[in-house]
A protein has these predicted regions:
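Hinge/cleft segment of the Venus flytrap/periplasmic-binding protein
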Residues: 19-20, 36, 125-171
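Short hydrophobic segments within beta-strands
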Residues: 11-14, 77-78, 158
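Short beta-strand segments enriched in small/hydrophobic residues
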Residues: 7-20
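Short beta-strand elements in bilobed, periplasmic/extracellular small-molecule ligand-binding domains
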Residues: 10-11, 33-56
């Protein structure tokens, strides 16, 4: 974990109408908190809610306020696909001492990864996930076969050194 010796880390959450924007984010947060409580119980997780409908100016104000209030935070995790919100803010404000871990290989996240404002991205092979869903539906509906309700998928940890070698469309 990038925050091994820190006392406090930031958890950025995308919210819509005051609630976490997706079930996926909710599940990731639950797993993250469980992991942290078992392995790093003394690390305080400080949340920052970012409304999905906010403007870039609004994001900047929220982030400036957050980092002014929490000057010792050096690590951030985002559980949605918008790590670039923090990454772009760090570039604009020339903050080079904060690491961000995010999800999803979207182009803006990849740009921030290449520039060094995002440290890591977890990529999840969306094409493979989609293929496996359709395959399971076919087996269940057409072939009348029982399908496993759990489908574990590989992930990849992307850094600026390997991001250009990631093949997102590979099955």
């Amino acid at each position: 974990l990038i925050a091994g010796h820190d006392k406090e880390i930031m958890l950025m959450k995308q919210v819509k109408n005051g609630k976490v924007a997706s079930r996926q984010q909710e599940n990731r947060e639950q797993g993250f908190r469980h992991y942290m409580s078992e392995h790093f119980p003394k690390v305080k997780i400080t949340e920052l809610d970012i409304p999905a409908e906010e403007s870039n100016l609004g994001y900047g104000k929220k982030l400036e306020s957050f980092f002014s209030t929490h000057p010792n935070i050096r690590n951030c995790i985002t559980l949605g696909s918008k790590a670039y919100i923090v990454g772009e803010f760090l570039l604009k404000t020339n903050r080079r001492n904060i690491q961000i871990m995010g999800y999803d290989m979207v182009e803006k996240n990849a740009q921030c990864l290449r520039k060094g404002s995002v440290s890591f991205l977890i990529a999840q092979h969306a094409y493979m996930q989609g293929y496996n869903c359709v395959d399971s539906l076919f087996k269940a509906i057409v072939l009348n076969k029982k399908v496993d309700p759990t489908n574990y998928m590989p992930i990849e940890l992307l850094t600026k050194e390997n991001v250009d070698f990631y093949r997102r469309t590979q099955l």
